[in-house]
């Protein structure tokens, strides 16, 4: 392999420091920002966002300060079909997606990687907090970042062996505070920029408003049901609800009520008390295994069912292109559409998209 790399630059501090570190290692680098929005109003600049027009200028400034060529690649068509359309389709079908995983899978480590190869560059470099290592058998492993509070391995479980072999995460061995110190020492204008928090194409965290505006559809009101199927109120459209949600229900009850299930076919949302949200068996499809080629028999792992979830012990089995995890303890508000990611301590075994919960 050569020492030529493409640095995916979002305009944030992490990707900027990743670029600096790669230059320090002697790599021949070019900086790239992916243009994701054909309609710039979708990616409008706002606090805690990424990939807006302002972010392009920040990334360009950092690349210039590092004496590094910089380009903007237009991936807006692919972003629309593989991220936004999938996001909307999921909510319309009562599923809660993770668009960051789709963006990594279809853009950063697929489309951008393909473009890097066309440019005769062997590596894609990002500012993710994770690590890639090679085991004694020549298999590439995805590992958690040393800074567990910033670890992003959950949203990277979809990387293949080929992609991992051409990926570098320079920040995997450091803490966020160290990254900011480097950015300040280099005079980067984004050194104190806040971390991105929300979905990049959703303003003010209102994903339902985004879906209505983007599609031009009106999603009709329907019935709230209790767990016995009795009507207990009216909801404002199924796209506004996800499993475990409490806010915005507008229902009075002796105890707090939460969303237990969303059924777009009947246009109903089932509510339950907190103790009705727990489940122990989680099945996932569209799987990708990293540390092993397949799971034979039963495997003891720690597993996560959402990004901000602490891994919990489970026994996992594989059946063709699906995996099933049986948790030692029931887990709260497990949601179809999110990822089930398996860990062998700090190593990602693999994962998949949750398709069934019991």
Protein language model features and the residues they cover:
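AMP-forming adenylation/ATP pyrophosphatase catalytic core
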Residues: 127-133, 139-358
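ATP-dependent adenylation/nucleotidyltransferase module used to activate substrates
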Residues: 1-157, 168, 177-178, 184
